[in-house]
Amino acid sequence: MRVAAQVLCLSGSLRRVSSNTAALEAAYRLAPSTLELLLYKGLGELPLFNPDAETDPLPSAVAELREAVDSADALLIACPEYAHGVPGAFKNLLDWLVGSPDFPGKPVLLLNTAARGSYHAQEALAEILTTMSAQLLAARPVMVALPGAGCSVTQVLENADRCAELQVALRLLVEALAAH
Protein backbone atom coordinates (compact mmCIF):
# COMPACT_ATOMS: atom_id res chain seq x y z
CA MET A 1 0.00 0.00 0.00
CA ARG A 2 1.36 3.39 -1.03
CA VAL A 3 1.40 6.02 1.68
CA ALA A 4 2.44 8.93 -0.52
CA ALA A 5 0.58 10.11 -3.60
CA GLN A 6 2.73 9.97 -6.73
CA VAL A 7 3.09 13.21 -8.68
CA LEU A 8 4.88 13.09 -12.02
CA CYS A 9 6.76 16.31 -12.76
CA LEU A 10 6.91 17.29 -16.43
CA SER A 11 9.23 20.06 -17.59
CA GLY A 12 8.40 21.55 -20.97
CA SER A 13 12.01 22.55 -21.53
CA LEU A 14 14.85 20.68 -23.18
CA ARG A 15 17.45 23.20 -21.93
CA ARG A 16 20.29 21.71 -19.97
CA VAL A 17 19.92 24.52 -17.40
CA SER A 18 16.19 25.28 -17.33
CA SER A 19 14.34 27.40 -14.78
CA ASN A 20 11.29 25.17 -15.29
CA THR A 21 13.27 22.04 -14.52
CA ALA A 22 14.95 23.80 -11.57
CA ALA A 23 11.54 24.70 -10.12
CA LEU A 24 10.37 21.08 -10.40
CA GLU A 25 13.59 19.79 -8.84
CA ALA A 26 13.17 22.28 -5.99
CA ALA A 27 9.56 21.13 -5.51
CA TYR A 28 10.88 17.55 -5.39
CA ARG A 29 13.21 18.53 -2.53
CA LEU A 30 10.52 20.49 -0.68
CA ALA A 31 7.74 17.90 -1.03
CA PRO A 32 6.10 16.67 2.16
CA SER A 33 6.11 12.98 3.00
CA THR A 34 2.53 12.69 1.71
CA LEU A 35 3.76 13.37 -1.85
CA GLU A 36 6.28 11.39 -3.87
CA LEU A 37 7.44 13.58 -6.74
CA LEU A 38 8.99 11.84 -9.76
CA LEU A 39 10.91 13.81 -12.38
CA TYR A 40 10.25 12.75 -15.98
CA LYS A 41 13.44 13.05 -18.05
CA GLY A 42 12.45 11.56 -21.41
CA LEU A 43 11.11 14.63 -23.26
CA GLY A 44 13.98 14.67 -25.74
CA GLU A 45 13.66 10.94 -26.44
CA LEU A 46 10.10 11.01 -27.77
CA PRO A 47 9.64 10.48 -31.51
CA LEU A 48 7.59 13.02 -33.43
CA PHE A 49 3.92 12.29 -32.99
CA ASN A 50 2.41 10.24 -35.78
CA PRO A 51 -1.08 8.76 -35.40
CA ASP A 52 0.05 5.84 -37.57
CA ALA A 53 2.54 4.90 -34.81
CA GLU A 54 -0.19 4.71 -32.14
CA THR A 55 -0.41 0.97 -32.52
CA ASP A 56 0.67 -1.92 -30.37
CA PRO A 57 3.51 -1.92 -29.65
CA LEU A 58 3.99 1.81 -29.09
CA PRO A 59 7.47 3.27 -29.57
CA SER A 60 9.35 2.45 -26.35
CA ALA A 61 9.80 6.08 -25.25
CA VAL A 62 6.06 6.67 -25.71
CA ALA A 63 5.15 3.50 -23.80
CA GLU A 64 7.42 4.60 -20.93
CA LEU A 65 5.83 8.08 -20.89
CA ARG A 66 2.30 6.70 -20.86
CA GLU A 67 3.15 4.21 -18.13
CA ALA A 68 4.65 6.99 -15.97
CA VAL A 69 1.65 9.26 -16.52
CA ASP A 70 -0.88 6.47 -16.03
CA SER A 71 0.67 5.37 -12.72
CA ALA A 72 0.88 8.92 -11.34
CA ASP A 73 -1.90 10.26 -9.15
CA ALA A 74 -1.34 13.76 -10.54
CA LEU A 75 0.92 15.78 -12.83
CA LEU A 76 2.90 18.92 -11.97
CA ILE A 77 3.85 20.79 -15.14
CA ALA A 78 6.30 23.66 -15.59
CA CYS A 79 6.48 24.78 -19.21
CA PRO A 80 8.23 27.75 -20.82
CA GLU A 81 6.85 29.95 -23.55
CA TYR A 82 8.41 29.93 -26.99
CA ALA A 83 7.15 32.28 -29.72
CA HIS A 84 4.01 32.96 -27.64
CA GLY A 85 3.17 29.28 -27.41
CA VAL A 86 3.90 25.88 -25.95
CA PRO A 87 7.33 24.63 -27.12
CA GLY A 88 7.09 22.02 -29.86
CA ALA A 89 8.76 19.26 -27.87
CA PHE A 90 6.24 19.59 -25.05
CA LYS A 91 3.27 19.80 -27.42
CA ASN A 92 4.62 16.60 -28.97
CA LEU A 93 4.60 14.95 -25.52
CA LEU A 94 0.99 16.03 -25.01
CA ASP A 95 0.02 14.74 -28.46
CA TRP A 96 1.32 11.29 -27.49
CA LEU A 97 -0.87 11.39 -24.35
CA VAL A 98 -4.11 12.20 -26.19
CA GLY A 99 -4.62 8.54 -27.04
CA SER A 100 -3.93 7.31 -23.51
CA PRO A 101 -7.14 5.84 -22.06
CA ASP A 102 -6.03 6.72 -18.51
CA PHE A 103 -5.37 10.43 -19.12
CA PRO A 104 -8.92 11.85 -18.99
CA GLY A 105 -9.63 13.10 -15.47
CA LYS A 106 -5.93 13.18 -14.54
CA PRO A 107 -5.34 15.94 -11.94
CA VAL A 108 -2.86 18.53 -13.27
CA LEU A 109 -1.30 21.56 -11.61
CA LEU A 110 0.59 24.12 -13.69
CA LEU A 111 3.57 26.20 -12.55
CA ASN A 112 4.48 29.45 -14.28
CA THR A 113 8.16 30.22 -13.68
CA ALA A 114 8.46 33.20 -16.04
CA ALA A 115 9.15 36.50 -14.31
CA ARG A 116 7.45 38.22 -17.27
CA GLY A 117 4.41 35.99 -17.36
CA SER A 118 4.48 33.65 -20.38
CA TYR A 119 0.71 34.02 -20.38
CA HIS A 120 0.29 33.02 -24.02
CA ALA A 121 1.86 29.62 -23.42
CA GLN A 122 0.05 29.14 -20.12
CA GLU A 123 -3.34 29.86 -21.71
CA ALA A 124 -2.55 27.58 -24.65
CA LEU A 125 -1.40 24.83 -22.29
CA ALA A 126 -4.57 25.11 -20.19
CA GLU A 127 -6.67 24.93 -23.37
CA ILE A 128 -4.81 21.85 -24.63
CA LEU A 129 -5.10 20.08 -21.27
CA THR A 130 -8.80 20.95 -21.00
CA THR A 131 -9.34 19.52 -24.49
CA MET A 132 -7.56 16.37 -23.30
CA SER A 133 -10.02 16.19 -20.35
CA ALA A 134 -7.40 16.84 -17.68
CA GLN A 135 -8.65 18.01 -14.30
CA LEU A 136 -6.90 21.36 -13.79
CA LEU A 137 -6.42 21.84 -10.05
CA ALA A 138 -6.26 25.64 -10.17
CA ALA A 139 -7.87 28.24 -12.40
CA ARG A 140 -4.44 29.79 -12.99
CA PRO A 141 -0.91 28.44 -12.87
CA VAL A 142 0.91 28.85 -9.56
CA MET A 143 3.40 31.66 -10.07
CA VAL A 144 7.03 30.91 -9.16
CA ALA A 145 8.80 33.94 -10.62
CA LEU A 146 12.33 32.88 -11.54
CA PRO A 147 14.90 35.06 -13.32
CA GLY A 148 14.92 32.98 -16.50
CA ALA A 149 17.30 30.63 -18.28
CA GLY A 150 20.27 29.59 -16.22
CA CYS A 151 18.45 29.50 -12.89
CA SER A 152 19.66 26.56 -10.82
CA VAL A 153 17.79 24.48 -8.27
CA THR A 154 20.17 25.86 -5.62
CA GLN A 155 19.14 29.42 -6.50
CA VAL A 156 15.49 28.45 -6.19
CA LEU A 157 15.99 26.75 -2.82
CA GLU A 158 18.01 29.69 -1.45
CA ASN A 159 15.17 32.12 -2.21
CA ALA A 160 12.56 32.11 0.58
CA ASP A 161 9.90 33.72 -1.63
CA ARG A 162 10.31 31.08 -4.36
CA CYS A 163 10.20 28.28 -1.78
CA ALA A 164 7.00 29.76 -0.35
CA GLU A 165 5.48 29.82 -3.85
CA LEU A 166 6.42 26.19 -4.39
CA GLN A 167 4.94 25.31 -1.00
CA VAL A 168 1.64 26.81 -2.21
CA ALA A 169 1.74 24.45 -5.20
CA LEU A 170 2.58 21.47 -3.02
CA ARG A 171 -0.28 22.28 -0.61
CA LEU A 172 -2.69 22.51 -3.55
CA LEU A 173 -1.58 19.06 -4.67
CA VAL A 174 -1.94 17.57 -1.18
CA GLU A 175 -5.42 19.06 -0.73
CA ALA A 176 -6.63 18.07 -4.19
CA LEU A 177 -5.35 14.51 -3.92
CA ALA A 178 -6.82 14.09 -0.43
CA ALA A 179 -10.21 15.06 -1.86
CA HIS A 180 -9.80 12.98 -5.04
Feature-to-residue mapping (PLM):
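Short, glycine/serine-rich, charged loops/turns that create anion-binding
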Residues: 14-15, 44, 115
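N-terminal beta1-alpha1 ligand-phosphate binding loop
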Residues: 2-34
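Glycine-rich phosphate/pyrophosphate-binding loop and the adjoining helix
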Residues: 2-3, 135-180
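A general structural signal for well-ordered alpha-helical segments in protein cores
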Residues: 7, 20-24, 62, 90, ...
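Short hydrophobic segments within beta-strands
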Residues: 10-12, 40, 111
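N-terminal beta-loop-helix "entrance" segment that forms/cooperates
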Residues: 42-59, 151-152
